[in-house]
Amino acid sequence: MRVSIITETWPPDVNGVAFTVHGLAHGLAARGHSVQVVRPRQPGIIAQEDAVATLAVRGAALPRYPGLRFGLPCGGRLRREWSGMHPDAVYIATEGPLGCSAMNAAKHLQIPVCTGFHTRFDDYVGHYGLGWLTPIATAHLRRFHNRAAATLVPTRELANELSQLGIGNTRLLRRAVDTRLFHPSRRDATLREPWGVGDNDPVVIYVGRIAPEKNLGLAVRAFRKLQSRLPGARYVWVGDGPARAALAAHNPDFIFAGTQLGEDLARHYASADLFAFPSLTETFGNVTLEAMASGLAVVAFDQGAAHEHIANGISGMRVPADEPQAFISAAFALGVDDVLRGAVRQNARIAVAALAPETVVAEFESLLKRLTQENSSGNPALAARI
């Protein structure tokens, strides 16, 4: 197949969408497909993708996240590009101006389109004092995704939520986790030493954007309760974002490791003991899978990855979304009970063992083939290329 993937975020951007889309693109290429990635040009970075073709378009900085960019409209360029390339399918991962241009161009050229639902922007805007934009964002998401032949979602729970928003024709595509990279064997005593913890002192870790929409105040409260029982406990924060400065100013004992990638990120996960993830705005939460693969005891709200992959009390703790006190209690229980935490850590890795990237890419390939077949009955040339 010839597949064009449109995304407004791509490595070296550090977020779950960028990593997920990068894995899907390179996974398809490894299976012999011709893959084009359309994304905003990243200043100072030369596109060097051996396995996939890159079409870099104009972009602009995202407000409050200067390191991230969104693509500007480029419908005419995409129509010209695809008129020559003739992609069998288009996958649009993001709903910004670039994604909208891609949708219009694909529809104009009668190319089958599917979308991915990665971010609840309708939830995010309220955390930045823009709650009045919520109905506008919801209407945009509904209109955008309903133009696609299918919208790919990582959980049945999200499919049900989107159905309530009026977004139909969702199909399940699980998220992958690299269990070879994220592994308990990467635990590193030399990394823990500067954290000032002994062998038996629990380390709580947070990985992700340090931003208002992540509900970080609850994580702080949960840690302080644990620390009141275990003064040697430490809280390590991996990532960056607009809330970091204030968080550090109010919590001088917290350890901020900055952005970590690859094996360094895996070492940080494995060198901790408990992953407390307080976010209520995730469509999935890839970091939950990474923490579980690393053998951490996870406490999270009962949604996204936690809902899908945590057996409560066995491979982690998941609590109702409207019960912040239950989150604090669950984190405390996992932190103070060494036996419980040890059992949960072993079971956590087992729970995600089947989510290998190769398996998920094969599922993505199958979905794209089905999409093209459903649209090729009147186009024998298209069917012959599949």
What are these regions (language model features)?
Residues 41, 157, 176:
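Carbohydrate-associated surface elements
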Residues 326, 340-354:
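A short, well-ordered alpha-helix in the C-terminal region of glycosyltransferases
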Residues 82, 145, 259-260, 267-272, ...:
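Short alpha-helical donor nucleotide-sugar binding micro-motif in glycosyltransferases
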Residues 297-300, 310:
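Short hydrophobic beta-strand element within catalytic cores of glycosyltransferases
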Residues 197-224:
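Conserved donor-binding/catalytic core segment of Leloir-type glycosyltransferases
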Residues 244-264:
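Nucleotide-activated donor-binding/catalytic signature segment of Leloir-type glycosyltransferases, i.e.
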Residues 312-313, 317-324, 333-338, 353:
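Conserved acidic donor-binding segment of nucleotide-sugar-dependent glycosyltransferases
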Residues 280:
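Aromatic "clamp/platform" in nucleotide-sugar-dependent glycosyltransferases that forms part
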